[in-house]
Amino acid sequence: MKLLPREIDKLLLFTAALLAERRKKRGLKLNYPEAIALISFVVLEGARDGKNVAELMEIGRNVLSKDDVIPGVSEMISNVQIEATFLDGTKLVTIHDPII
């Protein structure tokens, strides 16, 4: 199977998000890459489900709380930007202060 670089990136993101989700379910606090991966994955899947940018900005802010991440991680992430494919094309979704 031959994948484009963008498709490889999406698969890597999915793998990291799956790992983060499993660790969160086990009660472990997430680190920076895991937090970014999980938030990004939720936004990408929401776009695939037909949600709009405004909905995804709100959903993205509710994926994780400060209790879900290692101390200091929430301060490191001021915003997350994800390029997602919607029914009407590709758009940039920006989530400000994603971990509250």
Curated annotation (Swiss-Prot):
Main localization category: cytoplasm
Catalytic activity line of the entry: urea + 2 H2O + H(+) = hydrogencarbonate + 2 NH4(+)
One of the protein's GO biological processes: urea catabolic process
Domain of life, source organism: Bacteria
Enzyme Commission number: 3.5.1.5
Keyword Hydrolase (UniProt): yes
Name of the protein described by the UniProt record: Urease subunit gamma
Annotated GO MF terms: nickel cation binding; urease activity
Family: Belongs to the urease gamma subunit family.
Pathway(s) where this gene product acts: Nitrogen metabolism; urea degradation; CO(2) and NH(3) from urea (urease route): step 1/1
Family matches, as Gene3D superfamilies: Urease, gamma-like subunit (3.30.280.10)
GO cellular component: cytoplasm
Keywords recorded for this protein, A-Z: Cytoplasm, Hydrolase
